[in-house]
Amino acid sequence: MTAEPPDDHFDLRTRPWIPVRTKEGASSIGLRDLFLDAHRIDGLAVALPPAASGLMRVLCAMAARITTLHTASNNDDWQDLRYDLLEASEGFDPSSVDAYLGEHGSRLRLHDPIRPFLQDPRLVDQSPNRSGVNKLVMARPAGSNQVFFGHFTDDEQVALPSAEAALHLIAQLYYGPSGQCTPRTVSGKRFGNTVAGPLRRSLSYHPAGRSLFETLLLGIPAPGTWPRPGRSGPVGTAPADSCPWEREELPDPLAPPSGAVGPLSALTEQYQHAILLQPGPDRESVVDATITWAFRENRPPHTDPFLIWDETKDGTLRARDAEAERSLWRDLDALVLMNRGDSGKRPLILDGLVGGQIPEAAFRSLRVSAYGFDQDRQTRDRTYFSASTPPLFALLETSEEAGDNVLALGVKEGREAAEKAAQRMEFALRSAWRSYTTPFSDDKPGRNGKGGGPWPGVALAAYWPAAEERFWDSLDSGDFTHALSSFGRLALEIYDEVTRPVASTPRGAKAREGARGLVRSLLDRSTS
């Protein structure tokens, strides 16, 4: 009879829970194998984008510890160390990997009875009511929410494999909702509401190298972007820069939370939720979960290095929202241009990846992976998505010569031209539809102005995929000189196709031709 294996409380160092891609295919591995074989792994294969986004931050923080890139006497020394590590391409030092994972072994167990990974064991007493495992899984409906991804109900909770639960735990900590939550009582004070996770509704951009080893090193923020101790409170009161699993004490839920004081806390310690998973008897699955508030106040803000920051009307900076209908290429100029013509900022992580700061081979293979979660600011989750760019070295390579920025500026002009053509086409189709469908007795300007009809939606669904293909063709050729006429011609073709069914009727032909000039003028303007 085979002996039962010892209970390791689902040790994340050795249990297979992180999906990765290699030349042999996809598989799942633990933290130890991930770091030891990172230079032989192509990249992560996490199917849940919000989990992939959060996991990248966790892994980059661990990589910083293992390589000592979490410390820096000055920026030049830090850049030199990273350059040498990338150039050697030998992977992470095995002894450093084992030393780090060994030091924090008990904190890297998903179901550890004392300090489970990224969880708060105090919730056993402070929050006796459970939230349900459905609440943990963002794709499952909970409470009275609508069913989108599967038929799950609160009356019948379906257990989740522990390997999957670890990923959903990370996703909740970074993208969790605000508003009502399972109540928690601390020192006699009971509250049942929380604020949103730090990345809620955001679009996160991560540099991607030829291997996971390169990707993790490229994803460690440079010293010039680190938050500094003392910015979130009186000098000398800020805690040391650490990850949650490294700290000896759990934070006081009723005290004001500390801000980020360095790269480690900036990457891993911005959560606003407290979570505790309830494992099944075999600890191979999660059968219940408690999700509640971690602090009564928001953490002090900081500039996340993986987000695009746009300037609002009042001059403040705000992270760009994730929009499922907006393709990655439309954000490309905001990724590559350091000066966009306003006070907006590209992701700070890209500022340290220009030519000369990393080896040439790594630079010429550099891509960007994007992870987005289209949500509102409270509880509604729409959909999540991921995308990747081709190599960006031609756009990121800049110098003091003005000619080096021509292609990057062309990307911006191309995107603006595509959006202008889309807006003009949509407006023209709305106008044509109103002219075609307005009753003769009400055929006056301003009537039924809100009705756009079905044409704009049909046209935009055809336009954006075709515009994306045309954009990449222009980028490949390195020429955006005639971008407006190119996208205008595409918009005109789609306008004609969508309105063709009514062109044979007098009223339809009149409506069609009356608005067609709005799109046709793009061709005239681009050639004038």
Feature roles, as predicted:
Residues 161-164:
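Short Cys/His-rich metal-coordination motifs, predominantly Zn2+-binding knuckles/fingers
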Residues 166-169:
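Short functional micro-motifs and their immediate structural scaffolds
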